Amino acid sequence: MELSRSAAWSALVFHKHEVDKKTMRDMFAGDSDRFVKFSLSWKEMLLDYSKNRITSRTMELLLELAHSAGVDEKRQQMFQGAPINFTENRSVLHTALRRPPGYVLEVDGLNIGDEIAGVLFQMKNFCEKVISGKWKGYTGKSITDVVNIGIGGSDLGPYMVTEALKPFAHGGLDVHFVSNIDGTHIRETLKRLDPETTLFIIASKTFTTQETLTNAMSAREWFLARAVEEEYIKKHFAAVSTNQEKVVEFGIDDANMFRFWDWVGGRYSLWSSIGLSIALYLGFNRFEELLAGAHAMDEHFLNEPFNRNIPVILALLGIWYRNFFDAASHAVIPYDQYLHRFPAYLQQLDMESNGKRVDENGHTVTHATGPVIWGEPGTNAQHAFFQLLHQGPDLIPADFIVPLKSQNPSGEHHDMLLANCFAQTEALMKGKTEQEVRAELSDAGYDEADIQKLFQHKVFSGNRPTNTILVHELNPFMLGSLIAMYEHKVFVQGVIWRINSFDQWGVELGKQLARTILPEIQSAEAVTAHDASTNALINMARTFREENIRKESAQLSFF
């Protein structure tokens, strides 16, 4: 049966008409316990979901949907290592990466607990050598800078975490990230570094990823321009990969190759050896705290009943708006500058996971799936796109994330930040009525004619849903918990939508075509093999490239 024809779904369709008759402003006015009913506390985190277009009956029906969709069974399968990534026949065990040592879990005949412990031990020893200064470069100097070269999950997660946890860095190393194949990215990064004190981490599972290997070769050339001897590569390059042959061929000592596994998806890989740059920057003990925070959320997700389960509640609210209110996007607004890369990280996590149109049976879905995820830090966001949130025609649910403790207390700064965060969620919920606007304009001295012209522009409809996620402090443990919370939210939604949240075939077609187009751009012959638009674009690039080469040759011959 199609999801949209199920009893639980149909009940929600009918119930939505009842909810439409009420505003959140009225709901709060009629229930002094609304916050208590619709909030959850867990460790040093509070989820306030009372500013949503829901009633107790809404939550009952959404929870019924989750149970009828088999979320509990699928959750157990994931944690036990069943191949729930059914299009690639793989287990999904990023949760195993953050479990405390000493457990037994077999995948393909191997106890992955031992496998993970071995890689963590290797990472710890490596980090201790580099951080302590015992690891020396080719001239005998200690390492001062680490450059992580990767893309997608090999970049977004580590970059986000190192930015978010800057106050917890040990201070002995600077870390840099290169992902874009645009040569500007690596050139701008390298121009301020010293080859004698720089360590590169090449993060690529297959060691064949075009963008990563192109950047890695540029880094290698830059290094050898000063160091000359290829033997010195072993002192300045490490790899996170499964392809030992390619790693050694590059010149990296296989003792400095850190493995990970097929059951670790790229967007879930920061918990694995892909997190080596995190461990180097923060220190291995802080990396362990990050893992511990994620594991604590895993335990919460695995063991709490759905009505007290933060990831489940967030997932159900997302489905409520995506499927019953036609909300095509979801904003994430962290009121913490250190989390400025968090929305970008969640874009990949959510959109690569649930941006699917085919269900587990190979049929085109008849319901909406993953929304567009976007956002910026508050209060910058308020002066950029909050106009749309408040008065635009579309309903855009939003998550507000804010720590109560600032890592940089300075006068009233943090109090003002908190005030803005809380004010925005209240404003989105309450809005401002015509009566309130008219009274405000009248008090400001406007006459009736001017009020009549202006009042509609100053009315806020309100009834715009938000979640507020309060944490005591943004530290490694809590960041780990936040990331895992969103991972499990995405998982639950994928189960309900009956899609595979763990493959990403959508990234492949463009890469395949790029491999064909690259030699065509470099060819001397006009291209006609594509559609008219693509042919024209390639040929324009070809012509410009050829003319540029001729100009450069003419300038060289002149001198």
From Swiss-Prot:
Record bears the keyword Cytoplasm: yes
Family from the record: Belongs to the GPI family.
UniProt entry keywords in alphabetical sequence: Cytoplasm, Gluconeogenesis, Glycolysis, Isomerase
Organism: Chlorobium phaeobacteroides (strain DSM 266 / SMG 266 / 2430)
PANTHER family: GLUCOSE-6-PHOSPHATE ISOMERASE
Source domain of life: Bacteria
Gene: pgi
GO biological process: gluconeogenesis; glucose 6-phosphate metabolic process; glycolytic process
GO MF entry, a single one: carbohydrate derivative binding
GO cellular-component term (any): cytosol
Designated name of the protein: Glucose-6-phosphate isomerase
CDD domains cross-referenced by the UniProt entry: SIS_PGI_1, SIS_PGI_2
Chief localisation class: cytoplasm
Annotated catalytic residues: 352, 383, 511
PROSITE patterns per the UniProt record, alphabetical: P_GLUCOSE_ISOMERASE_1, P_GLUCOSE_ISOMERASE_2, P_GLUCOSE_ISOMERASE_3
Enzyme Commission (EC) number: 5.3.1.9
Pathway: Carbohydrate biosynthesis; gluconeogenesis; Carbohydrate degradation; glycolysis; D-glyceraldehyde 3-phosphate and glycerone phosphate from D-glucose: step 2/4
Function: Catalyzes the reversible isomerization of glucose-6-phosphate to fructose-6-phosphate.
Keyword Isomerase listed: yes
InterPro entries xrefs: G6P_Isomerase, G6P_Isomerase_C, Phosphoglucose_isomerase_CS, SIS_dom_sf, SIS_PGI_1, SIS_PGI_2
Catalytic activity, as annotated: alpha-D-glucose 6-phosphate = beta-D-fructose 6-phosphate
Location in or out of the cell: Cytoplasm
